[in-house]
Amino acid sequence: MEKDAEFAKDWPTLVRAIESGIESHDGREAQLLAYMLSHNPTHPLDVLSTIDEFSLREDFLISVGPNKADILRDLIMREKPRMLVELGGYLGYSAVLFADAMVKAHGGDEGLKIYSLELDPICAAIARQIAQIAGLAHIIEVVEGTAASSITNLVKENKITSVDFLFLDHVEDLYEQDFKVVEALSVLKKGAVVVADNVIRPGAPEYREFIRGDMKKEQGWESRGVKGLIWPGNFEDELEVSKLVGLEVNN
C-alpha cells in the first residue's frame, strides 16, 4: 500500500490514465497545445521539456518521453540521416526531437527532411503547430492518413526516393505489415536504420520475430533490442534497432 501511494505521488497522471483506461484522444491533445502556447517555449529542447512537463503534471501523453529521447538522439547523431520517416507522429514530440538532432548532426539544415505520418487529423494539426513553435516546420512535414497509403503516395510523387531512418511508433500490430510496405517500395538502401518503439510494452512480438528472422538476416539486416523507459512511470521497455548492413532490399 505504501508503494502504491508513493507511485501515485510520483506519477499522478499515469495513475489517472490507468484508472480510467484512457490515455489519448480525449481532448488532452488540445489541452497540450493551449499549455504550450501559454508557456511560449522558444527552442526545440524547451518544446520537448514543455510536453514532458504537461505529461507529468497535467495529463499523461503517449509521447516517447525523455529517457527514450536520449537514446533516439544518440542514434541520430551516430547515423546522421537526411531523410527520416516516422509512422505515427502523434503530437510531434519525436519529429521535433529528430529534426533538432539532425540539424546538430549535420551542422545545419540543408537537405534535411522528416515526413511524420499521422492518421488522426486533430493530432496532425497540433503536430504542425508544435513543429512551427519549435522553429522546425521547414524540415518537418506532417502527412495525414494511414501510414501505408501516405508513404506509398510520397514515393509515387517522388518526394521520397530513399529512407535513411524509419521510426515505427503507431500501432504495434501494424509494424510488420507497414515495414513490408516500405520495403516493397525499394526505399530502404544499405545503411538504412529502422527503429520500432514499444516492442515490450505494449509489445510487438510478431514484428520482433520477423525482423530478427533468418530471412531478414540473409537480406543483410542486423537487429537488437535497446532498453528504454516508458515515461511517466519508468516502466522498462525496449526499442528494436535494425540496420541494413548487407544487401539492398529488392535490388
Question: Which positions does each model-derived feature cover?
Answer:
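S-adenosyl-L-methionine
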Residues: 41-64, 70
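Short alpha-helical
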Residues: 42, 46, 93, 121-122, ...
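Alpha-helix termini
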Residues: 101-111, 155-160, 184-191, 213-220
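C-terminal substrate-binding/active-site "lid" region of AdoMet-derived donor-dependent transferases
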Residues: 174-251
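Active-site segment flanking the S-adenosylmethionine/decSAM binding pocket
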Residues: 2-11, 89, 140-202
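N-terminal auxiliary segments of SAM/dcSAM-dependent transferases
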Residues: 1-47, 58
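Short, well-ordered secondary-structure micro-motifs
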Residues: 22, 97, 126-129, 152-155, ...
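SAM cofactor-binding core of SAM-dependent methyltransferases
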Residues: 60-149
